Amino acid sequence: MLSGEFRFRSLIVATVVLVGGVALAATYYGTVEEVASDANEITIKLNGKAGGVKKFTVPMEAQVLIDGKKSGLADVEVGQSATIVADGSNNASRLTLKNVKAAGTKGTKAGGRSPDAAGVSAGEWPQHRGPNRDNVSMEKGLLDKWPAAGPKPAWKQTGLGMGYSSVAISDGRVITMGTTGSDEVLAAMNAVTGKQLWGARVGRVRKDGTGDGPRGTPTIDEDRVYTLGANGDLLCAKADKGNVVWQKNILEEFGGGNITWGISESVLIDGDNLICTPGGKRGTMVALNKLTGKTVWASPVEGAPQAAYSSPIIVKDVGEKQYVTYVHTSVIGVRASDGKPLWKQNASANGTANCSTPLHTGNKVFTASGYGTGCALFELGSDGEGTLVYSNKEMVNHHGGMVLLDGYVYGFDEQILKCIDLATGKTKWQNRSVGKGSVTSADGQLYLRSENGPIALCAATPDGYEETGRFEQPNRSDKPAWSHPVVCGGKLYLRDQDTLLVYDIKK
């Protein structure tokens, strides 16, 4: 097993504000329609309602990346997702292409969903809760049972400092947040060896009795990484070296106050926009241009509620695409195009801490929170309005999150692992399993992490609890293990404060 200690101080990169160049180039998103490598040209079908096609000239010096690997125009194939940076004459300087792979679960039943992670390979986990923000990995060929001692360790990294951030993984880098001294720090490691790559200061450390440091997980988008600290410090940095592109404090800019246990949101990237929830008087939820940090819109939700501890999701299987998230006392839906508030419901919200990220399938949204509150299912109409289908106390989920597979919700109802039928809200089975914790799914299995340490593997089936492996996490900190487990690239990642443990779980 490889191991190392992350030394942040020598790695922190000086702030570099990029101004020149932003207005001289544009970024285009779409799907490859035609490639003429002999003529150095590529044509893509543009995303969005406007659609259309656009042709680019690709000079010999242009950078071409396919699934994170350096390639040439001759390797590009029709159907790949494409992100192209080009000048005003349509001369491309950078092409980032990805093979589209369907993210399958065990098929779909009524109310089920096969995640659509177009353009993201199984070896990537670029944000909180994975490509679709649903904690469902696209990995296949994984161990379906573990030896008594657990899976084989791959590498370990220490020196990450305090915090509950999990990891984001893309282009061979593992990126998380931690602390050094009085600073919150963004940190990158090599995904194969764990070797330290770089560190960048985010802001000052927030201290409280439940554990100091950051709570959110970074979001990687193409060649940039975005992260939000516990004091509201928002950072955009280059993913290769950690050079800072822009930064701001969202609480100061939008008139928000920090929440009891610190800002915990993991920001969402959707096209050109970064979505976050400052919970301020000048914007409950906001969209910022991801390249510059400038405000695109600020959503004035009634009552100007503070932020919650949840993170937003995209719901586009309705009349108009919207963002859904928790705020302090309710669940809200906001129109993606302009930030117009569409609906607000408090059936599954509490006034203490709403932590779990919502789930969705089609026009249904499932939410749950702790502190005795419970869960709710909402149906979104063609006008985007959310209507309550049911609410009950079958899933009182604190902050371990839930997964939705084939029409069934799996998650921890306080101390008990449950399987709930999404359509009815009724419990199919329950088991004490590892006790209160978090859950991730991959290859037909549930990966269960107790906040007290044990890790277990069980089948993701509504037929009953079938545990096929368990081990005790070594190097336990004195804090609850609240960072969600991640399955990516044939490995299981477990962050516990100062330490990141990585295990081989490929067959």
Feature map (PLM): residue ranges:
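Noncatalytic, solvent-exposed loop/strand surfaces
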Residues: 106-507
